[in-house]
Every structure is written in C-alpha cells, then in structure tokens.
From Swiss-Prot:
Residues 375-404 have a biased composition (Low complexity). Keywords: DNA recombination, Transcription, Transcription regulation. This is Very late expression factor 1. CDD domains: DNA_BRE_C. Belongs to the 'phage' integrase family. The active site is at 214, 242, 307, 330, 343 (o-(3'-phospho-dna)-tyrosine intermediate). Residues 346-363 have a biased composition (Acidic residues). InterPro entries: DNA_brk_join_enz (IPR011010), Integrase-like_cat_sf (IPR013762), Integrase_catalytic (IPR002104).
Length: 415
C-alpha cells in the first residue's frame, strides 16, 4: 500500500471515521452549535441590548440541515491528523477535533482544509467553496475565497458532460422510456419487491411528462388527482406542497392525457406504491433505474431534463422568454434562459399544433391545459382518445368545489 499522504484520505477511510464521528457522544450538541453559527445575523441586531433579546431564529429546512450535517462530518474528518487517520485500532477519541469547534480554535487553515477535501474526493469548486464557508463561519475566521482562475478536475469533467449533453435528443429518450413502460413495466406487480422501484419510477415519470411537475411533487399526486386531471384537464386542490407566497392558488392543469392515463393505469393496480418517506432519495434512484431498464445511457441522468424539454419547446415555438419565465415562476428571464436548449429536444416542423406547459422547480402550481383534440406528434405522448378532456364537466369528482375556472389557466404551445 502506498503511504504517501496524498492517499491517506479516501472513501474507505472516510466511511470508517464517519461512523465514529456520528456516534461521538457530543455529535448532536456540537452539530447544533455549528449549525447555529451559519446564521447571518446583522451586528446591529446581535449587539443591540434591546432587540437581541427578542431575536427569532427561523428553523432551517430539513434539506439545509441534511447538507450541513454532511459538511460537518467531512469537516471533523478533515481535522483528524494524518498520523491517526489510517490507524483504525488507535484509541483516538475525536475529542480534540470536537473541542476545537466548540472553542473556535482552528487546527488547520482553510487552505489545508481544501487540500484535505480534494485528497478525499473530486469535488466541484462550488462544493469546495461551500465547505470552506461552513468552516470559516463555524470558526469565526475571515472569509476565504478560492481563486477565480481555478478550475478543478471535477469542474472540467462536468463541463465535458454538459457539452456532450447538447447532442442528446430528448424526444428519442422520452419515447424510448415510454415504450419500455408501455410494453414491460405496466405489466409488473408490486407484490415483487424487486419490481417496485420500476413501477414507482414509471408512474412518476408519466406524471412529470403529463404535467411538467418536478419529481418530488409528482409523487404526491393520488389516483383521484389523476382522475380529475384526465377528466377535466385541470385540478385545484391543496396537496400540502410548498409554494411561493405571491401565489394565490395551487392549480394543477393537465397538458397531455396519454402519459397521465398510463400513470393512472399502473397506479390503480398498485395504489400504495408511492407511499414512501418525504425526505428520501428514492424517487431519484427509481428514475435512474427506469432509464437503465429502458437501456437509456446518459453520463449524468437527471429528472429535470423533462422540464428542460417542455420549456425549450415552449420557447422554440415562439413563446416570449418573459412568459416562459413567468410560467416557470422565475424571478428573471436570465434564470429561464439557463434552462433553454441545454439538450437537443428533437423539434420538427410538424409539431407546431401541440399544446403544453411547464412548472417551476420551486413551485407546486402547474398551469397546463389539454384542449380537446390537441395533437401531439409524439407516439407515446399523443392520441389521447378518452374524450374526457373537457374542463366544463362538473360531476362525479371529489374535488367539485375546488376546480378552477378555465379563465385562470394559460393556454400554451408545446412540442
């Protein structure tokens, strides 16, 4: 084994120490202290004898705490001296590292932390900077910025992947996945544990494609929600999802019935399949497994490629950038421009009559409309023949009193 310092910090070593760090008797207490130090409270408030006693600290979101915990564990690991690192039988207690955090007495400089982090694994410049910020806030150190001229190996790798992604034709990928769902996955049963991930992935994928919702919002829809979407073309119902304050409604309007009908068909046979923990990575794992099952090869598969596909088609078919931005709930069109044409969406001139819409990744309101007879040229996304697309039907649904009127939905062109 090579004992050069550059090989001391690796995944095997980290996994061993990660367990010991998390099991330390002071872990929870010091993690809470460290987390609290990430708050940016203005000095004029913090040092004011009157207002400081009334300060209210807004709780961190679960996802933020999850990120902080990951950084905290890596920080403690990087504080361990090299001499103790690979001596697994040593009685090193980690008290030195934890106490340095409490007392704000740095054991290493920020630059050394960078070196040790890069020794552990290849990370992006952004990830490394976030870890450094976490450290300097924790230890009350001056701000440390990685030089602008720096491009780390992981950044170069991602840049190459993004360049390759421009040649990926999303239309072909979507058709391939839908074909796999139609011919194979919809016939599977959740009675077999091994098949459950594929079934979940198929249902959520079809909902995303039919509504433009993000993956974590798609999995919250019920069979009743799908029935309403398919029957009326839209749904207004509070489903307990976070939305921006200026939104006054929580509307879900169906664009394309075919994917939703396919989702419903599978969902009805497996009604409890989406009952999974709220804060879980399961939907993303299911999505990747779905792509693998369909023999779709991508360097960096991401569920939001569907939203890229929808929004790019809206823009390419002539919708003004500002309107696409508004529908995606972006603060500025610059944010939306970042979404557009990152992939080859596979547009052709025969698709100009399609109707569709998209939703923002930070909002749960989907404004999608599927007018009766809308033509979508894609085999698996088109030919909705149910005849239930009328949004004027007001009977036989659990959400009769919550259905939004047609005049509050935008009609969108889509490929």
């Amino acid at each position: 084994m090579n004992n050069h310092p550059a090989t001391l910090r690796n995944e095997s070593s980290f996994n061993y120490w990660k367990s010991r760090i998390q099991n330390h008797d002071k872990f929870d207490e010091i993690f809470e202290l460290t987390t609290d130090r990430q708050r940016c409270t203005p000095d004029e408030v913090k040092n004011n004898s009157l207002w400081s006693q009334y300060m209210f600290c807004k709780p961190f979101a679960p996802t933020t705490l999850k990120s902080y915990k990951s950084r905290f564990i890596k920080l403690i690991y990087c504080l361990i001296d090299d001499e103790y690192l690979n001596n697994y039988y040593d009685t090193h207690t980690l008290n030195k590292e934890f106490n340095s955090i409490v007392q704000q007495q740095p054991l290493i400089k920020p630059e050394e932390l960078c070196r040790r982090m890069l020794e552990l694994r290849s990370v992006t410049k952004e990830t490394l900077q976030l870890t450094i910020n976490f450290y300097t806030n924790t230890m009350n150190l001056p701000e440390y910025k990685i030089p602008k001229q720096v491009m780390l190996p992981r950044d170069k790798e991602i840049k190459n992947i993004k360049n390759n992604e421009k040649n990926i034709v999303l239309r072909e990928i979507i058709n391939t996945i839908l074909d796999c769902i139609e011919k194979k996955i919809k016939h599977l049963s959740s009675e077999f544990v091994h098949d459950r991930g594929l079934i979940r992935g198929a249902i959520v994928f079809c909902i995303m494609l039919g509504t433009g919702m993000r993956i974590n919002r798609s999995r919250h829809l019920s069979v009743d929600d799908l029935n309403t979407l398919i029957k009326r073309g839209k749904l207004r119902q509070a489903i307990g999802l976070k939305r921006k304050k200026h939104r006054t409604s929580n509307s879900l309007n169906s664009i394309k019935q075919k994917p939703l009908e396919l989702a419903r068909e599978i969902y009805i046979k497996n009604p409890n399949i989406l009952n999974i923990s709220k804060n879980t990575s399961t939907p993303f794992k299911d999505f990747k497994r779905l792509l693998k099952e369909a023999n779709v090869e991508m360097d960096r598969p991401r569920s939001n490629m569907i939203r890229h596909y929808l929004s790019s088609n809206l823009y390419n078919n002539g919708m003004p950038l500002q309107k696409v931005a508004r529908l995606m709930n972006h603060e500025s069109s610059a944010s939306t421009r970042h979404y557009l044409n990152k992939y080859d969406v596979g547009v052709d001139e025969s698709d100009d009559n399609d109707e569709d819409d998209d939703d923002d990744e930070n909002d749960d309101r989907i404004i999608d409309e599927n007018p009766s007879g809308a033509n979508i040229s894609n085999y698996d996304i088109n030919n909705s023949s149910s005849g239930n697309s009328s949004s004027n039907n007001t009977s036989g649904n659990d959400f009769n009193n919550n259905i939004s009127s047609g005049d509050d939905a935008d009609l969108l062109s889509f490929n």
